[in-house]
């Protein structure tokens, strides 16, 4: 094998100048080939990234039209079924659970006799039904104390507790609140 290479080199050196091709620099050819490959790769990457960018914009436009943007879970609000399950009561200034309820912290209006109130079970704060329903539609916490509102399901049936205005739950929570902050559940 070495002899064959040696003979080829001798024949290449012994060729006449008239028959020899014009000299060229092999380093220049190698540099041009590398640059051509790099240019092809760069153009390919640009094409792929542009396609990905256009697909992302198209999917974002489609999702904006069909779905609202995602919101953090804490500020998502409560479902209407859960809102309806929260207890209501009719305000009467002389009734025991309503003695500490003076005004709605949302609209800042004093409660009048006959106003329909919703008392939050976790903290015992009371608000006008329309005010608190609007608030809880976009928030899941009490507007006064910011306590997260958690409605527990019935252990027997798995459903939400009924919304009765005469249930013991709101009265008990309000009475505990009247006794002092140390007695809160």
From Swiss-Prot:
What's its membrane topology? Single-pass membrane protein
Q: Which reaction does it catalyse?
A: S-ubiquitinyl-[E2 ubiquitin-conjugating enzyme]-L-cysteine + [acceptor protein]-L-lysine = [E2 ubiquitin-conjugating enzyme]-L-cysteine + N(6)-ubiquitinyl-[acceptor protein]-L-lysine
GO cellular component terms? membrane
Which is an annotated GO molecular function term of this record? Answer: transferase activity
Q: What Pfam families does UniProt report for this protein, alphabetically?
A: zf-RING_2
Tell me the pathway.
Protein modification; protein ubiquitination
The listed locations are: Membrane
The EC number on file is: 2.3.2.27
| Region spans: Disordered | 161-185
Which CDD domains does the entry link to? RING-H2_EL5-like
ZnF regions (RING-type) run across 104-146
The protein's UniProt keywords, in alphabetical order, are:
Membrane, Metal-binding, Transferase, Transmembrane, Transmembrane helix, Ubl conjugation pathway, Zinc, Zinc-finger
Q: Which GO terms describe its biological process?
A: protein ubiquitination
Q: What class of enzyme is it?
A: transferase
Name the residues that span the membrane. 28-48
User: Could you tell me which Gene3D superfamilies the record lists for this protein?
Assistant: Zinc/RING finger domain, C3HC4 (zinc finger)
Q: Where is the composition biased (Basic and acidic residues)?
A: 170-185
Query: Which family is it part of?
Result: Belongs to the RING-type zinc finger family. ATL subfamily.
Recorded domain comment: The RING-type zinc finger domain mediates binding to an E2 ubiquitin-conjugating enzyme.
Q: What is the protein named?
A: RING-H2 finger protein ATL8
Species: Arabidopsis thaliana (Mouse-ear cress)
The beginning of the lineage is:
Eukaryota, Viridiplantae, Streptophyta, Embryophyta, Tracheophyta
- Supply the gene name: ATL8
């Amino acid at each position: 094998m070495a002899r064959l290479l040696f003979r080829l080199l001798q024949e290449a050196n012994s060729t006449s100048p008239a028959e020899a091709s014009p000299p060229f620099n092999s380093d220049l050819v190698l540099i041009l080939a590398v640059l051509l490959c790099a240019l092809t790769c760069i153009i390919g990457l640009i094409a792929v990234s542009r396609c990905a960018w256009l697909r992302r914009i198209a999917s974002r436009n489609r999702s904006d039209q069909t779905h609202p943007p995602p919101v953090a879970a804490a500020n998502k609000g409560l479902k209407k079924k859960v809102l309806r399950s929260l207890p209501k009561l009719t305000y009467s200034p002389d009734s025991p659970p309503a003695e500490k309820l003076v005004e709605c912290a949302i609209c800042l209006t004093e409660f009048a006799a006959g106003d329909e109130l919703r008392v939050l079970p976790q903290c015992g704060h009371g608000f006008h039904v329309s005010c608190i329903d609007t608030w809880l539609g976009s928030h899941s916490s009490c507007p006064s104390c910011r306590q997260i509102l958690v409605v527990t399901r019935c252990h027997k049936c798995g459903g939400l507790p009924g919304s009765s205005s005469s249930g013991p739950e709101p009265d008990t929570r309000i009475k505990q609140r009247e006794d002092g902050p140390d007695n809160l559940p």
